[in-house]
Amino acid sequence: MDYLKTVVPSQLMAERGANLVVINPGSSNVRIGFASQDVPFNIPHCIARHITQRKDDTPRLSVRDKMLNCHATPSQNAERERAYDIIASLLKIPFLDEEMPSANQALPPKMGRVDALSSQQNKDDSKFTWTDVMDRSIKSSTPIVDKDADVDPLQRSTPDDTEPNSEENMYKEIIFGEDALKIPPSESYCLSHPIRRGHFNISQDYSLHQVLEDLRTIWNWILTEKLHINPRDRHLYSAILVLGETFDNREIKEMLSIVLCDLGFSTAVIHQEALAAAFGNGLSTSCVVNIGAQVTQVVCVEDGVALPHTALALPYGGDDISRCLLWVQRRHRTWPNFQTDPVNRPIDMLMLNKLKESYSQIRSGSFDAVSVVHSYEHEKSVGHQKTKLSALNVPPMGLLYPRVLVPEEYPPPPRSWFQDYDDMLEDTWQTSDSLYSSGNGGFGMWDNYPMFPTRLKKFDNIGLVEAIVSSILSTGRIELQRKLFCSIQLVGGTASTAGLAPVLEQRVLNTIPSNQPIEKAEVLQSRSYPLFVPWKGGVILGVLDIGRDAWIHREDWAKNGVHIGSGRKYRDSYFLQAQAMCYYNS
């Protein structure tokens, strides 16, 4: 302990972080890096596999995200219009039937405008290159362990079973990361996202086995190609999994098995994302608001312990704001005549996310920006047009008024998913059939998961302000409530939205019931980029964990799996039961 008091933090990170790999998986991106790094690799959490088309089929890119509801229903459109009117009134945005200035007229005094594109930026934004799907590397008759480790032997073409110059062998079998999002639509690839809305993307068309295989392949590729860790040397490394509170016990167990058994790490530990976020900003008590790409989580942390009864999950995030941006532009008739389809064309979603990150902010009055919008309908000639984007302050307000977002819905997993016989805390065999949906009910993927109804409360239609107030007030102690209201912490990519923090402060304070003796609400400024705060917190927790009482060894996990022990650490953790049941005799 004397050494910890005198050592420089950077030196401690370098000494103990060289053999620690921190993995923070999300629905849209996965953040992986050595604990000794300042920032992790942030890579799209997806994989594209080459598929063989029948002769009578037209080759095309397919997206394996089966959704019950991709487009807004008439009732949802009506609610969305009402929500837009409320937001427009609050932000003092002129309605469409009011007279708007033409493109040649000067903007009125209350209308803001951002001409953020310089000539050089305009030139760079107009350039786009599709992913080259042809494998131009030289095929060797001797397989290389490092390169072949991330490919399933059953799906990999080898010189022994195919001709080297065959047409099938010319295509890349697997494409990862952002390259997978830029595959030309005419190519025969299937794009898969293993995680959606904070859960495994299991459906009748995407089996659990394939989800796990895709996770293993993606993570293995990052470890090999980005971190340059040879599969034969991974027994020298330990892994830290920083997982969100939305993940189910079985999902945690499966990811732990991937890290230890498939990827070959010697030991691993799991940390809650909310707890890691608090430590990442140097806090021990905080209300952590994690605004992810597809899920927003609110969890209160007291003295380094996440309080389970305060956890809330909201089924919307940054991706929904990006789609709302497109809807707002079409509503204002400012979007070019492009067939933009963010659901079925991943490159369109990538473009909308970049527009959102560049221009969306919360501010009063009309807010416009001039930007280049791309059309990816024709592969040989990617079209682009410079256009004025209107009401850019409306989409991020969807965090406060979620009815304007209209998130897509995913079907529930098959019934067999709920039968986890290893979980000693769940009597799934006693669950009646009425608790499961047939898949046609139109509800979110996991909303009817019945095993722990109070484990993580989920709300579809409440805004972020109401969620924060409800979470903090559920602690029940006025002293703690005052601390939490003064230490609200925003993490996640969307947390960087300009103007979000002051709006939350004001609205949270106004939403607190008048009978509560609380006079102040404050959103703390993040010490680093909010997207990487949970990952950085995982680094800190891993480096400072000297005793490693909660670390799980590969041999013990492979032999015993989930079992009860006598250790005390994480015994009271309500979320990480997959790890909490794996104690070690002290």
Swiss-Prot record:
InterPro entries associated with the record: Actin (IPR004000), ATPase_NBD (IPR043129)
SMART domains per UniProt: ACTIN
Organism superkingdom: Eukaryota
Region described as Disordered: spans on this chain: 141-169
A Pfam entry, by short name: Actin
Family: Belongs to the actin family. ARP8 subfamily.
PANTHER family: ACTIN (PTHR11937)
Protein name: Actin-related protein 9
Organism field: Oryza sativa subsp. indica
Phylogenetic placement of the source organism: Eukaryota, Viridiplantae, Streptophyta, Embryophyta, Tracheophyta
Underlying gene: ARP9
